[in-house]
A protein has these predicted regions:
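Phosphodiester-processing cores and adjacent nucleic acid-binding clamps
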Residues: 3-152
Length: 152
């Protein structure tokens, strides 16, 4: 595979690799990649799949899913969620929580991910959309969970 940096062509042999923690423009103040540019770059690097894991939301999932399929890439749907002790408690010590990446591995996982993100906004919002371990226990089926970052 070759990539171009300006007029310089660089040949690289890259093993199969898939990004599983990607923020788009829907992760305000943290993601700059537009979905079309993400698809273009993934194809340039010879990737066969790519994930979307925006902060606390799934606003770009439909656009991402359609764009990935159109580009011949496997879309992996996910979200970076904030986990606190009690998502209903409005306490300054419970604002940020730990960060987790949740990826849907099947349709049941997608439905559970949508439920978790919805609850984070409708029941758990306090500065940020939040869930707790009890919700995660209830809606874990079909999900892959990973630490997200240094905040995880």
């Amino acid at each position: 595979m070759a990539i171009f940096v300006g007029s310089l062509q660089i040949r690289i042999d890259m093993p199969q690799f898939t990004h599983l923690h990607v923020h788009t423009q829907y992760s305000i103040l943290d993601g700059a990649a537009s979905i079309p540019s993400l698809m273009k770059r993934a194809k340039e690097f010879g990737m066969t799949a790519v994930a979307i894991t925006d902060h606390g939301n799934m606003f770009g999932v439909k656009e991402f899913y359609d764009a990935a399929n159109a580009a011949g890439l496997k879309p992996i749907l996910g979200c970076e969620v904030y986990v606190v002790k009690n998502h209903r408690e409005k306490d300054k010590d419970e604002t940020a929580g730990d960060h987790l990446i949740l990826l849907a591995k099947n349709l049941k996982g997608y439905h559970n991910l949508v439920k978790l993100v919805s609850y984070s906004w409708t029941e758990g919002f306090y500065y940020k959309p939040r869930i707790d371990k009890e919700l995660l226990r209830q809606y874990h089926e079909g999900l892959i969970c990973s630490s997200a970052c240094l905040g995880g």
